[in-house]
């Protein structure tokens, strides 16, 4: 498992976001076009794992950015894909950590450390039920990587940026009720 450099694996923007279509990018291997085009505007990172390449793309849409994770085989055939995000929410792809032998940890949205667990063999998965909230995939019964994470509720506009801190602090009325019962 290793992070790929931009000279080994990159992307070239083919079309920009429009009102009706997402941006798309062509994959480049060793600086050469492959003809493989995926949804996504910015290649955030790429990882090599057991003759597979895992690519992380964002859409570059302010206030509604999605993270697209693609897994390709050695011939760049798409094995699996997932999208993290939701309407009216945004994220920033940060803190990618390779955790051998088969896990990629990162942050994107909802104050969560997400994990992509790469699978040597495909596994059965129930569509719409097997992934955490905020993760979507095309309808199919098998996957080649699992997404794990427990997204926190989105904070309200003007509220503290730390949803975790807000979630753990009792409200004044709850504290008042507890002291009255004693």
Predicted region positions:
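Short beta-strand elements that form the blades of beta-propeller/WD-repeat-like
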Residues: 1-20, 51-63, 70, 95-109, ...
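Terminal domain-start segments
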Residues: 1-47, 149-170, 182
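Repeated scaffold domains used in trafficking and secretory/extracellular systems
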Residues: 2-8, 37-50, 87-97, 133-151
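Surface-exposed loop/turn elements that mediate protein-protein interactions on large endomembrane-trafficking
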Residues: 19-37, 69-86, 113-137
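A contiguous binding-surface segment within folded domains or other stable secondary-structure elements
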Residues: 37, 41-87
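An exposed acidic His-Trp-rich patch
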Residues: 75-105
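Mixed-charge, glycine-accented linear interaction segment located at domain edges/termini
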Residues: 109-174
């Amino acid at each position: 498992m290793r992070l790929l450099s931009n000279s080994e694996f990159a992307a070239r923007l083919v079309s920009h976001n429009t009102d009706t279509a997402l941006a798309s990018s062509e994959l480049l291997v060793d600086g050469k076009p492959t003809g493989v085009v995926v949804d996504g505007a910015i290649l955030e990172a790429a990882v090599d794992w057991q003759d597979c390449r895992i690519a992380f793309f964002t859409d570059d849409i302010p206030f509604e950015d999605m993270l697209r994770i693609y897994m390709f085989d050695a011939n760049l055939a798409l094995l699996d894909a997932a999208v993290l995000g939701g309407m009216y929410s945004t994220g920033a792809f940060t803190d990618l950590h390779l955790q051998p032998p088969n896990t990629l940890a990162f942050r994107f949205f909802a104050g969560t450390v997400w994990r992509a667990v790469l699978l040597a063999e495909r596994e059965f998965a129930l569509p719409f039920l097997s992934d955490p909230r905020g993760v979507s995939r095309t309808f199919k019964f098998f996957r080649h990587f699992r997404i794990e994470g427990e997204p926190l509720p989105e904070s309200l506009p003007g509220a503290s940026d730390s949803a975790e801190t807000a979630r753990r602090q009792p409200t004044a009325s709850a504290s008042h009720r507890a002291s009255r019962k004693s």
